[in-house]
Amino acid sequence: MPKQKYQKIITALLLCLSILLIVAGCSSDSAQKSNSTAAYTVTDSQGHKLYFKEKPQRIISTSISTDEILIDLVPSSRIAAFSRLVDDPGISNIVERAQSVGSRVDGQSSEAIMALHPDLILIPDFVKPEVIQSLRDMNLQVYVYKTPKSFEDVRECIRFLGEAVGEKERGEMMVTAMDEHLKKVQDKIGKIPKERQKRIVFMRSNGAYYSPEASFNDVCRYAQVRNALEELHYDKPGIVNQEAVVQLNPEVFLLAGWNYDGQHDPKQMEEDLLNNPGYLTTDAVKNRKVYTVPAKHVLSVSQYIVNAVEDLADAVYSK
């Protein structure tokens, strides 16, 4: 082979090798940048930091509120389990949609959770500290969120959970959709002068419950009704005695419809309240203004809390 031709072949081979090395180097840099972009760190409500190399793919939700938020944040393929309440139509707004996820967990059972090999566990701050710690002791990624007590808390919770699962933009979209829904509901209700706003008391099976920090207070404000229990000024939350409720003399009694144990039939609870001798002198009972609204809305601390505003306004002003 002539020397000149041999040199041309060598030069061509070296050029090809150089191109391959450049391409490989670019691919490596691209992969490193991609991995760097995918990695992120979040801090939960207790100040605990969680580091993720990539978005979690086996997420476990241990409460109905995070069940409802999570299903709108990520595809079902990234959810390993929901809470057991997700299948109860009395308290869950996503019963049918939740069927796309096969497993259910009890937030108190560390072993059952561990068996599902989760890469992220969402758990409320009211769970016992020892349960949370037992999960962390298993080297599991546990994100403890603050239980919402207002509409702003719900917005914040959605945003924080969005960050935790690596879907910050999706979380913002959910908050925007929630606020747009709330505006439509408020536009439907219209403006009701304060002096014409109905005074109500929300009753449980064991009586009225006083709580100065409860999401229901915000529901009332947006529905333009007055929660008569806010006129009380107790030192701590608790059951309000019958005499105090009678003194408040509400115009409406409100009940949450959820027969969670087969012994709390909503219609029967209405009748029991209307026939309770202790409340016969209240305007609510005298005028038979005892209404039941869906518990899955009025007890919600997810985006579905907006539905409670509409339910309450409809019950109080449309009946």
What residues fall within each predicted segment?
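Short secondary-structure boundary segments
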Residues: S63, D125-F126, T147, V252, ...
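A short, structured surface patch at a secondary-structure boundary
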Residues: S61-L116, L120-D125, A228
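Proline-aspartate-enriched helix->loop->beta-strand connector
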Residues: S109-I123, L140, N241-W258
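Bacterial Sec-exported substrate-binding components of ABC uptake systems
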Residues: P2-T11, L15, A24-D67, E169-V201, ...
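Short helix-initiation/N-cap motifs at beta->coil->alpha
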Residues: S45-G47, Q99-E111, H233-Q242
